Curated annotation (Swiss-Prot):
This is Large ribosomal subunit protein uL10. PROSITE patterns: RIBOSOMAL_L10. Part of the ribosomal stalk of the 50S ribosomal subunit. The N-terminus interacts with L11 and the large rRNA to form the base of the stalk. The C-terminus forms an elongated spine to which L12 dimers bind in a sequential fashion forming a multimeric L10(L12)X complex. Keywords: Ribonucleoprotein, Ribosomal protein, RNA-binding, rRNA-binding. Belongs to the universal ribosomal protein uL10 family. InterPro entries: Ribosomal_uL10, Ribosomal_uL10-like_sf, Ribosomal_uL10_bac, Ribosomal_uL10_bac_type, Ribosomal_uL10_CS_bac. It comes from the Bacteria. The gene is rplJ. One of its GO terms (molecular function) is structural constituent of ribosome.
Amino acid sequence: MALNLQDKQAIVAEVNEAAKGALSAVIADSRGVTVDKMTELRKAAREAGVSMRVVRNTLLRRAVEGTDFECLTDTFVGPTLIAFSNEHPGAAARLFKDFAKANDKFEIKGAAFEGKIQNVEFLATLPTYEEAIARLMGTMKEAAAGKLARTLAAYRDKLQEAA
């Protein structure tokens, strides 16, 4: 189906707005994946706060101009599925990585975060806000307990020397 100029401009504007508000983007090739599987992926994406869209490469190049995802333009070859993470930088990468494990024909082409091309594995392993806070609290708790143990041991040694 041929798109007229207004349709193309609307697509570019929509994708550009999505790109400006996104934390990260992941590019994939979904050739050969069944419609049922893609529907499942789209549903999972909505639940994870990820917006997905299949866009023509020429329109996508125009849409990402001036955004943090301009570095991905070299990966816009063949059918391109782009996903923007809106709530957590690793959400789209984690979603695509898990989907690619279950679907051999699904190929992840690249990912971008903070204006640089990133490894999908790196983005997928980024902790969520809650996970990062939990790790920090665990580290602080361990440090406090360790300091208490060292203080008690030093006090015990001091008492033994005095005796």
